Amino acid sequence: MASSLLTSSVMIPTTGSTVVGRSVLPFQSSLHSLRLTHSYKNPALFISCCSSVSKNAATSSTDLKPVVERWPEYIPNKLPDGNYVRVFDTTLRDGEQSPGGSLTPPQKLEIARQLAKLRVDIMEVGFPGSSEEELETIKTIAKTVGNEVDEETGYVPVICAIARCKHRDIEATWEALKYAKRPRILVFTSTSDIHMKYKLKKTQEEVIEMAVSSIRFAKSLGFNDIQFGCEDGGRSDKDFLCKILGEAIKAGVTVVTIGDTVGINMPHEYGELVTYLKANTPGIDDVVVAVHCHNDLGLATANSIAGIRAGARQVEVTINGIGERSGNASLEEVVMALKCRGAYVINGVYTKIDTRQIMATSKMVQEYTGLYVQAHKPIVGANCFVHESGIHQDGILKNRSTYEILSPEDIGIVKSQNSGLVLGKLSGRHAVKDRLKELGYELDDEKLNAVFSLFRDLTKNKKRITDADLKALVTSSDEISLEKLNGANGLKSNGYIPVPQVSSNV
């Protein structure tokens, strides 16, 4: 499966050394300057930020290694400190439930390996009770990724799988996960009135009895790390949640999840729910509280952060936010929000995600699922570090922090100072001058004015001006033919989706 991806080594600067990383990028085969031949499904994924690639990188290692730091001892129901937030990735279970996003067994294994490079604390890799093939795939991940201990850091991911409150599901989950060093089962049931009435057709007491029986059965098989999930917790009665969670804790669970399964909660509402449960559930201080938010109202990231602010210390996310209906909370959004603002506005909370692996992971998931992100998707979209407005371009040229709050290098992208500038009708003279300088042209004011005038005329007919266009403007500025330029070395404006251009040595 890896053969379907283009991998190019890029140099990532770190303190005191150079680390070589893998960038997984889709390109158009027509981009001869890159000397690439593989055709990709969606050329709009082209990212401008990866515009500076070391010539020496091609002969170097292609695996990004995180900063060497010993991983904290793993105790299922305890955290190394009160500010640590465990990242529970469910791309391979909840994410795969995206319509049209199914994965083959080899693809699931490859993504699991990449999630380990990303350093997720827990990866939920599927539903063993759904089919024999799924069980065998999960077993393979448990035997391989679930046993690959990093010798330098001691890191090994927790391998988790989901089960309904049915003994056959729980038995299948044990059969799949028992080979992992750190197996975890997530037993779940619905807790909202509407689900209990119409889906389960059970009373509150019957649901509690079913949950407790399932937890005890999981323990009897050998699980000592058991997570209990409240499906549709966001619409559940608060006092019933306190009661069923209290009984689950008494039965021996290590983690409890409050699911906003239909994405109905507002951030303040969800935060208040977590606060209430932490204050009123017997034994809640002896387990880790997890948040699981869906994105039906576009609030999954905000709700997840609200839950963390209220004291939750496990956040459940997917790569690119894929998942049922409108998707789940996005790993890259939640993690980068905590990295960017956690120390300042959320009492110092943090994760141990190796954020330099985010872009490579995002690209892999997009390619394997066929679920491509829109250009303006936060963190990983093609336009995240791209600027066309002249005012913004001028600021970026002076100091990137004027209009960028995140560093592209932090998510595994290497950019030159000007590589995020897209030249179009909103671009100013300064940006054009700087791009020409990058191309090797030092123009006096008179010549620059002539070129810029032609540039402005050209933008009336083309949405994006290419480097080839700029060169033609310079060399033929006295007798340039706009008609000729419109067909020169670039796509015409009809149907053209503006995406950044990369100039790299691969």
Swiss-Prot record:
One of its GO terms (cellular component) is chloroplast. Belongs to the alpha-IPM synthase/homocitrate synthase family. The keyword Cell membrane does not apply. Optimum pH is 8.5. Manganese or any other divalent metal ion, except copper or zinc. Residues 1-49 form a transit peptide. Determines the side chain length of aliphatic glucosinolate structures. Catalyzes exclusively the condensation reactions of both the first and second methionine carbon chain elongation. Changing S102F: In gsm1-1; loss of conversion of C3 to C4 glucosinolates. Residues 85-359 form the Pyruvate carboxyltransferase domain. It catalyses: an omega-(methylsulfanyl)-2-oxoalkanoate + acetyl-CoA + H2O = a 2-(omega-methylsulfanyl)alkylmalate + CoA + H(+). This is Methylthioalkylmalate synthase 1, chloroplastic. PROSITE patterns: AIPM_HOMOCIT_SYNTH_1, AIPM_HOMOCIT_SYNTH_2, PYR_CT. Keywords: Chloroplast, Phosphoprotein, Plastid, Transferase, Transit peptide. GO terms for biological process: carboxylic acid metabolic process; glucosinolate biosynthetic process; response to insect; response to water deprivation. Its cofactor is Mn(2+). Coiled coil: none annotated. Highly expressed in leaves, flowers, roots and siliques. Not detected in flowers in PubMed:12432038. InterPro entries: 2-IPM_HCS-like, AIPM/Hcit_synth_CS, Aldolase_TIM, LeuA/HCS_post-cat, PYR_CT. CDD domains: DRE_TIM_IPMS.
